[in-house]
Every structure is written in C-alpha cells, then in structure tokens.
C-alpha cells in the first residue's frame, strides 16, 4: 500500500496513535504499526511482524494484545501491567536472539546498536514509569525491568542482559 506509506511519513506519533485507536480494520492497523516501527527503527516488516504491539503500547493504553504471538488475548489472562511485562519480555528476547547471532558472526558493534535501539524503543513507548510498574508484576517481570534498565545504562557490548 504505497499510499498508506506516504501517509505515514506525514503523520506525527500522536496522529499515528489516533489513527490506530480509531481504526477497526486489522490489516490497515497492522500496516500502520509496521510502517511506523519500520520508520523509527529501520527494520523490515518481517523483523517485527507479530511483536509490534509492545512498541505502540503503554501501561494505560495498550493496543492489540490479540496481535501478539499468543493464541488467547493476554488482556483476559493477566492484569494490564503483567500483560505489558510479558509482551515486553517476549519482544526483547526475540530481538536479543538476533543480536546474539550477530555476535557469533563477529558483528559486536552492530549487535550492540541493534539491541540498544530496541531497548530504547521499548522504553520510549512504555515510558520509565511503566518500567517501574513492571517491577511490581512479579519476580520474572521485575528481573526483566531491572535488566532492561541496566542494559540502557551499560557500556558493555550487550549490556549484560540475560535471557530468561
């Protein structure tokens, strides 16, 4: 949909959020999300297919949990902050796998930039306050939030992040 991509370039982040909230057509919404994330992170749609929900979510207003890789809506299974934490961890681990592959190929700097851009995108869209809220959602979620913060403040090649 080239016309949709042209429209994306003209919209601000707030305008994109408004379009997404008002749209009831999943294919259009998914295209908008993919276009937005592709522009912001310079990834291809295949890199982010089902994981894009977290990047346009926050603790108060998360979107399309049913678009995640889980069969049932996380909204029905968890309080919103637990769902957010689980989605964030799933997304981050998926990108971390790719970064580990880059490291194994000797692409250390590329891996570090790749994973940091994802971590910063997560922080940008859910906010520092939401990272704090994630810590209240149980031991695993708290560990994830601590490690995300540690990664963002680290100068180590991969930030010392440990997959769970």
Question: What does each model-identified segment do?
Answer:
Residues 1-7, 14, 18-21, 25-164:
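Eukaryote-biased, non-catalytic alpha-solenoid scaffold regions
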